[in-house]
Design a protein with these regions (language model features):
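Beta-propeller domains with acidic blade repeats across secreted/periplasmic ectodomains
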Residues: 1-179
Length: 179
């Protein structure tokens, strides 16, 4: 059984309220089976604008890694793809613009915000809620703080919130699994 079809580049998925949020650039959709036939009956575009302004997308830079955070928000990374994200059908919530950032959203209120990160290929949390990201050049980094807190002080110029933490150095061999 195919739960959902006609998705453009689905690269992220997370469960919520009997359905799933799916990241399919430039949209985040909500899909749900409402009649028990294991096929999506409800299909709703919730957010749009992630990479939507680009004429050509880089396959290595698509949104990915939907994860639940300890803050009860769904977190993801937009990789290197810029965004001007808005909630479909709710213009009063405005637009959130970003470049090379991660993001999170509250699935109940649809509050969307920028998060520190900018992972290319992955993002996850450990059991203590610490955030880790990776890319080709930096195969494991820890996100030490959220930029929005440091940015509140105009007299403080913080270092990058990303810290390389691999024991084998900043760049290691990358072994592709896909054909």
């Amino acid at each position: 059984t195919i739960f959902a079809s006609d998705l453009a580049w689905p690269t992220a998925i997370v469960c919520y309220d009997g359905g799933v949020f799916v990241g399919a650039t430039p949209e985040i959709l909500y899909l749900k089976d409402t009649d028990g036939d294991r096929k999506s009956d409800e299909r709703r575009v919730v957010f749009t604008g992630i990479g939507g302004s680009l004429k050509r997308l880089n396959m290595q830079s698509l949104m990915n890694s939907f994860r639940w955070g300890l803050d009860n928000r769904i977190h993801g990374t937009a990789s290197g793809t810029p965004g001007k994200v808005r909630v479909v059908g709710k213009p009063e919530l405005g637009t959130v613009s970003f470049v090379r950032s991660d993001f999170s959203f509250d699935p109940r209120t649809l509050d969307f915000r920028i998060e520190s990160g900018g992972a290319q290929h992955g993002m996850d949390f450990n059991a203590a809620g610490q955030k880790f990201v990776c890319s080709n050049s930096h195969h494991i980094q820890q996100v030490m703080y959220e930029q929005r807190y440091a940015g509140a002080n105009p007299n403080f110029m913080p270092r990058s919130p990303l810290v390389d933490i691999p024991v084998d150095g900043a760049s290691a061999p990358v072994f592709r699994l896909s054909p």
